[in-house]
């Protein structure tokens, strides 16, 4: 996971610029150094994205998918992104923005981790990044205030389970944020392979060793 602990971390998480620059530079380096080999072996062109990446609120995305594809979900599911909505979001962003990446924001607090900071309306200050219809990143501004963090853990019935974690925040913690980038998923999508082939040592429900 890539984390930041600095004065401007909140703004960096909100505008997502750091991850855009990281992925753009990384894919440019892959294209420059291995683009020909990837095209020869997998028949795929390494595409370096333009910035900024498109951004959409989750509720607006569901509305757009219904209008565009007739895709609907029950109200109880609209606080999170379904697998089918992930897939359709790629078709939608390609058509309307000519882009392969899509940031999705404004998830339901019920569906996000207790340590995600929320705004004055209770909306988590985080996002998911979708590439080619697959989630590759979850990022967020983290809650650093002990009392707020404790309350959010209690709301999810986790206060006892994360007591050791909460104790650190009693001594003070600066504003911070971060994101976890799924390197295996990134490799899978880059080369057009299955996740089993993209990982060095695949782990799954039926494979724990070696």
Model segments located where?
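Composition- and surface-driven signal marking solvent-exposed, interaction-prone regions
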Residues: 16-19, 116-118, 141-142, 199-202
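Metal-assisted phosphate- and nucleotidyl-transfer catalytic regions
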Residues: 18-132, 154-155, 160-164, 172
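A residue-level signal for conserved active-site and pocket-lining positions in enzyme catalytic cores
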Residues: 5, 61, 104, 139, ...
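Single conserved hydrophobic/aromatic residue that forms the stacking wall/gate
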Residues: 1-13
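Short, glycine-/Ser/Thr-/acidic-enriched flexible segments
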Residues: 9, 107-111, 119, 134-136, ...
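A generic hydrophobic-helix recognition signal that picks specific residues
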Residues: 1, 132-135, 175-177
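Residues in well-ordered beta-strands of folded domains
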Residues: 104-105, 130, 137, 199-201
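Active-site pocket scaffolds in enzymes
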Residues: 140-141, 145-210
């Amino acid at each position: 996971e890539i984390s930041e602990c600095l004065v401007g971390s909140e703004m960096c998480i909100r505008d997502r610029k750091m991850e855009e620059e990281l992925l753009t530079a990384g894919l440019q380096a892959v294209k420059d150094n291995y683009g020909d080999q990837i095209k020869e072996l997998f028949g795929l062109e390494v595409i370096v994205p333009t910035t900024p990446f498109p951004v959409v609120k989750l509720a607006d995305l569901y509305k757009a998918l219904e209008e565009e594809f007739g895709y609907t979900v029950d109200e109880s599911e609209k606080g999170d992104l379904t697998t089918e909505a992930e897939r359709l979001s790629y078709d939608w962003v390609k058509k309307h923005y000519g882009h392969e990446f899509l940031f999705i924001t404004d998830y339901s607090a019920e569906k996000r981790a207790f340590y995600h900071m929320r705004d004055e309306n209770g909306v988590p200050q985080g996002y998911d990044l979708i590439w080619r219809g697959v989630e590759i990143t979850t990022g967020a501004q983290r809650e650093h205030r002990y009392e707020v963090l404790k309350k959010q853990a209690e709301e999810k019935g986790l206060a006892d389970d994360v007591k050791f974690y909460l104790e650190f925040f009693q001594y003070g913690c600066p504003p911070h944020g971060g994101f976890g980038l799924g390197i295996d998923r990134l490799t899978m999508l880059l080369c057009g392979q299955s996740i089993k082939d993209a990982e060095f040592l695949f782990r799954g429900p039926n494979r724990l060793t070696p």
